[in-house]
Design a protein with these regions (language model features):
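Outer-membrane beta-barrel translocator/channel fold
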Residues: 15-28, 32-33, 41, 48-57, ...
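Transmembrane beta-strand segments of outer-membrane beta-barrel domains in Gram-negative
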Residues: 43, 56-59, 133-179, 185-191, ...
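Detector for outer-membrane/organellar transmembrane beta-barrel domains
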Residues: 162-184, 192-247, 252-256
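Sec-dependent N-terminal signal peptides
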Residues: 1-9
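Sec/Tat signal peptide C-region and signal peptidase I cleavage site
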Residues: 10-14
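Active-site-proximal flexible loops/turns
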Residues: 37, 124, 187
Length: 336
């Protein structure tokens, strides 16, 4: 019953998933972060298994690739996101292109990004259980008929767009994004059901723990506190936490609140950077995190939420001597 109520809520008022490892899905967080990295080519993959022990599952995956264009400090990119929710197989696939551009100096970088793509949303109504299929004594009988009216659609395509902005200034990084700005219609029934816009705001501070200013950047240690705020229709959440970054290790502790009555959680994250060739900037990033609910949901019933991520970044041989804008400025990638 709990799962059916949750699924019905998803059908009635769609709500985007958000990743606890937002720093390992930067393009999903904000399209203005597209092309904002040290190398030439970056690829990210992140998977979220939400409420692990709930039947049907809530599973999400995002894959992105972005290409840094040094002449204007931005880039072009492509992002694919897939979500599968509940026993009825409510599935959403989105693919979008991203373009970003930056202005600034050796003291700051202000980036702008736009995103546009196509979403396909499907549901298998044959897997739903209605009240007239439940026997008072025997419960649900598989294959029993129902008088529930069939929907007009079980498959829907629509255009979707978003935009974002990000500012890296000194030891601060602050940004915001707005998704679904065209309010696409997601309805399966024919009655309009416009997808609410999703607003995101994020801010981070990089606290240098080193007394020796002559240390190389890779040898330093940092505390990086961050706040991420999401709002979509009446749903909202605030993610507050701290990362400790040293050498190839990045460890984090986060608290997420979801408003009155919503599920709150504590998140632990651990990230490893594996440098294959430091001179060329080639590296792998491996990340894992786990959310443990502290209110709204019972951990023993859900088993929490687990995420895994993989990132790869490299410099292309043909561009090793390419000119990069804003060489002296702090960049957004310095904050994760």
């Amino acid at each position: 019953l709990w799962l059916l109520i949750l699924l019905c809520g998803k059908l009635a008022v769609a709500q985007d998933h958000m990743y606890s490892q937002f720093f390992n899905s930067p393009v999903y967080l904000n399209p203005a972060l597209n092309g904002q990295f040290q190398g030439d080519l970056r690829m990210n993959l992140i998977y979220r298994n939400q409420f692990t022990s709930v039947p049907g599952g809530f599973n999400y995956l995002t894959a992105s690739v972005d290409y840094n264009i040094p002449q204007f400090g931005g880039g072009i990119g492509l992002i694919f996101t897939r979500g599968n929710e509940g026993t009825a197989g409510l599935t959403k696939n989105n693919i979008a292109g991203i373009y970003s551009y930056s202005v600034g100096s050796d003291d700051f970088v202000l980036s702008f990004g736009v995103q546009a793509g196509v979403t396909n949303r499907t549901v298998d109504y044959g897997k739903l259980v209605f009240s007239d299929q439940i026997d008072p004594r025997l419960g649900y009988i598989p294959g029993s008929p129902t008088n529930a009216e069939s929907p007009r659609f079980d498959n829907r395509f629509y255009f979707d767009a978003g935009a974002g902005v990000n500012l890296a200034l000194s030891d601060f990084n602050i940004g915001g994004a707005l998704q679904h700005i065209n309010r696409p219609n997601e309805s399966f029934t024919g009655t309009p059901a416009k997808l609410p816009m999703r607003g995101t705001a994020h801010v981070s501070y990089r606290w240098d723990l080193n007394k020796d200013e002559n240390l190389d950047e890779d040898e330093k240690s940092f505390f990086i506190p961050s706040v991420v705020f999401y709002k979509q229709s009446t749903a909202q959440s605030i993610n507050i936490g701290l990362q400790y970054k040293r050498h190839n290790l990045n460890a984090g502790l986060w608290v997420r609140t979801a408003g009155s009555g919503g599920p709150s959680a504590i998140t632990f994250s651990l990230i490893f950077d594996l440098f294959l060739n430091k001179e060329s900037g080639e590296k792998f990033r491996l990340g894992v995190s786990h959310d443990a609910p502290i209110s709204g949901l019972n951990y023993s019933n859900t088993s929490g939420t687990t995420e895994g991520s993989i990132g790869y970044e490299t410099t292309l041989p043909s561009r090793t001597d390419a000119y990069h804008k804003f060489e002296g400025a702090r960049r957004c990638y310095d904050f994760y």
